[in-house]
Amino acid sequence: MYTIEQIKEVIPHRYPFLLIDRIIEVEEKKRAVGLKNVTANEEFFNGHFPDYNVMPGVLIVEALAQVGAFAMLKDESNRGKLAFFAGIDNCRFKRQVVPGDQLRLEVEIMKIRGPIGKGHAVATVDGEVACEAELTFALK
C-alpha cells in the first residue's frame, strides 16, 4: 500500500489536481489499483453542481490516468519521466459519483510500444462501474 506522500514521490501531480488518495496494488508496468475518497469538501463541487454535487466525469478519467501513470512511473527505468494523455477511447460513464463515495480505480496496461502505451481503466463504487475507458499515454 502506498500513502499520499509515497504517491507524490512517483507522480508529479499536486493539490488541487492530485486525484488519488492511496495505491493499494501495483505491478510495475502492468497494473495498479488506487482509491479516491470523494468528500463534500472537493473544490470542484462549488461549481459542479452547487445544488446537486456530482464528480465531473473528466476528473474520474484523470484519476484513472494518474493510477496508470503510477504503474508506469513506479518502474525504475521510468523514474523522472512524465506520462501524458495521448487519447481516450470508448469512454462510458455508467454511474454518478457523489460525496461519500469511494472510487476504486483500476488500470491494466495492455500494450507498450516505445514511449506509447494503452491501458484499460475501470472506476467502480461499491462494485458498480462508474466509468470505463481505454487510455492511451505517452511517456516523456
Swiss-Prot record:
Pfam families: FabA. Coiled coil: none annotated. GO terms for biological process: fatty acid biosynthetic process; lipid A biosynthetic process. GO terms for cellular component: cytoplasm; membrane. The keyword Transmembrane helix does not apply. Keywords: Cytoplasm, Lipid A biosynthesis, Lipid biosynthesis, Lipid metabolism, Lyase. CDD domains: FabZ (cd01288). Gene3D superfamilies: Hotdog Thioesterase. InterPro entries: FabA_FabZ, FabZ, HotDog_dom_sf. One of its GO terms (molecular function) is (3R)-hydroxyacyl-[acyl-carrier-protein] dehydratase activity. Its main location: cytoplasm. Its EC number is 4.2.1.59. HAMAP family: FabZ. Involved in unsaturated fatty acids biosynthesis. Catalyzes the dehydration of short chain beta-hydroxyacyl-ACPs and long chain saturated and unsaturated beta-hydroxyacyl-ACPs. Belongs to the thioester dehydratase family. FabZ subfamily. This is 3-hydroxyacyl-[acyl-carrier-protein] dehydratase FabZ. The lineage of its organism: Bacteria, Bacillati, Bacillota, Bacilli, Bacillales.
